[in-house]
Design a protein with these regions (language model features):
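Short internal beta-strands
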Residues: 1-7
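Short phosphate-binding loop-to-helix
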Residues: 7-74
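Conserved core of the sugar-phosphate nucleotidyltransferase
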Residues: 16, 59-148, 163
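Hydrophobic helical membrane-anchoring modules
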Residues: 150-177
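Short, surface-exposed amphipathic charged segments that create phosphate/polyanion-binding patches used
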Residues: 40-43, 93-98, 150-157
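Generic beta-sheet signal
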Residues: 4, 28, 52, 81-82, ...
């Protein structure tokens, strides 16, 4: 596990925690997140990247294993369990908060060279998701859960996720299902 964190004063305590616990990390641009991810990948010689963001703390280990298997077996550039931007009518995707993305460092390099907007620089995989130049795949869910929101962007979101963790604690590697 490697953290890719913004180089700013707000992350000093996080950086201290990472150092104290001997967790690998790289600091980079706060606004050009694609650049930060790419530099992190190169620093640690990563061929592939599994992206889990701080606002989506609910990682399903079984889902991740299945996605890794599919990613390797299908030799694709990008795999995610989020909504496919080219399939706007599909409602069968995973709830916000369980987001997982797997992509190659080569794919990230190609997108970095093509990106022209600040929005795409700030949102690591938006360009990749919205471009047909990459071999992309989106994992679908069996049920419609578009209204379920488990990402952490507010205090209420954080309290909701804490309740979920407390229900399963100490077995925190619970499955989405």
């Amino acid at each position: 596990i490697v953290f890719s964190i913004p180089n700013n004063i707000q992350n000093k305590s996080l950086e201290s925690h990472l150092i104290e616990n001997k967790i690998k990390y790289h600091k980079g641009s706060e606004n050009n997140v694609v650049s930060r991810y790419l530099k992190t990948a190169k620093k640690f010689k990563a061929k592939n990247i599994i992206r889990v963001t701080a606002d989506c703390p609910l990682v399903d280990p079984k889902m991740l294993d299945q996605m890794l298997h599919s990613f390797k077996a299908n030799k694709i550039d990008y795999l995610a369990n989020i909504k496919d931007p080219f399939n706007k009518h599909d409602k069968y995707y995973y709830p916000d908060g369980f987001d997982l993305e797997i992509f190659t460092t080569k794919c990230l390099e190609k997108s970095f060279k093509k990106i022209k907007t600040k929005y795409d620089q700030e949102h690591v995989t938006t360009f990749i998701r919205n471009s047909k130049m990459f071999k992309r795949q989106f994992v679908k869910n069996d049920v419609e859960l578009t209204s379920l929101k488990l990402s952490v962007n507010t205090k209420k979101n954080l309290n909701d996720v804490k309740k979920i963790y407390n229900i399963f604690y100490p077995k925190i590697n619970f499955s989405f299902k």
